[in-house]
Amino acid sequence: MSGSYPEEMTRDLSDRLRAVVDALPLPEGMRVLEIGCGPGAAAREVVRRIGDGHVHAIDRSPRAIAQAVAGSAAEISSGRLAFEQVAAEDFTLPAGRPPFDLAFAVRVGALDGRHPEAGRQALSRIAAALTPAGRLMVGDGAAMAELRLPR
């Protein structure tokens, strides 16, 4: 799928992140939560692929969020991308906002087993923010896998 995007649209996306985004089920119009967005490159690419959908990208690092916001002015002003500085285990869906169809994370300690207690809390928070059919895809940068969520 990445071959269908002009070079100028994907220039800030590494091969690793391009492969991650290529592996995600991204029908047009969906709502996506990215956990651990870093400087926002994957979030911007997902926005490009989901038509009139929406991406809400979170990261615990204030510096990462500042970089993401600085590099995403057009996507933010379109209303299709938002960033929030919050840890996965502390995230809550803002009141009145529709739930997400998909959540994804790459190399996030709370979701890859490095921080089990934070992971339990994060999974509960993510499940609460997804539609009943919503999916969570987690990866290590080389492969993505779907995690079962507590419902």
Residue ranges, per PLM feature:
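Conserved SAM/SAH-binding beta-strand->alpha-helix loop
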Residues: 61
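Conserved SAM-binding loop of SAM-dependent methyltransferases across substrates and taxa
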Residues: 39-51
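Conserved SAM-binding loop
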Residues: 68-69
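A short glycine-rich, Lys/Arg-flanked "PGG" loop and its adjoining helix->strand segment in the class I
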Residues: 119-132
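A short acidic, Gly/Pro-enriched loop at the edge of an enzyme's catalytic core
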Residues: 93-103
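Conserved beta-strand signature within the Rossmann-like core of class I S-adenosyl-L-methionine
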Residues: 133-140
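A short SAM/SAH-binding and catalytic strip from SAM-dependent methyltransferases
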Residues: 101-116
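Conserved SAM-binding strand-loop segment of SAM-dependent methyltransferases
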Residues: 77-89
